[in-house]
Amino acid sequence: MIRVGLILCCIFIVGVFEASSADDILTAHNLIKRSEVKPPSSSEFVGLMGRSEELTRRLIQHPGSMSETSKRGPPKKGDFNPNELKPESNIC
């Protein structure tokens, strides 16, 4: 009976020791993990919905791109005439 109690006590002590060292290992691992990996800043992170907004912004910034030109089609006769622009004489 004493041997069984002694064996159970040893198992309990070893279990407590292993659990505490496992917590230390996890804590050390989490600290290392936090220091190595930087979270993305708000300007770096682009969500799934943000990607379509980013693509739309790019198309607006570059209206003469091939994709926009092909979508618009050929210019119509009455749309824009560069000869109609009058130079302003009041520009300093």
UniProtKB/Swiss-Prot annotation:
Keywords on record: Amidation, Neuropeptide, Secreted, Signal
Residues modified to Methionine amide: M49
Primary location class: secreted
Tissue spec. comment: Expressed in the posterior salivary gland and more specifically in the mucus-secreting gland cells.
Keyword Secreted in record: yes
GO CC, any one term: extracellular region
Signal peptide: 1-22
Propeptide: 23-37, 52-92
Similarity field: Belongs to the tachykinin family.
Function in brief: Tachykinins are active peptides which excite neurons, evoke behavioral responses, are potent vasodilators and secretagogues, and contract (directly or indirectly) many smooth muscles.
Protein name: Tachykinin-2
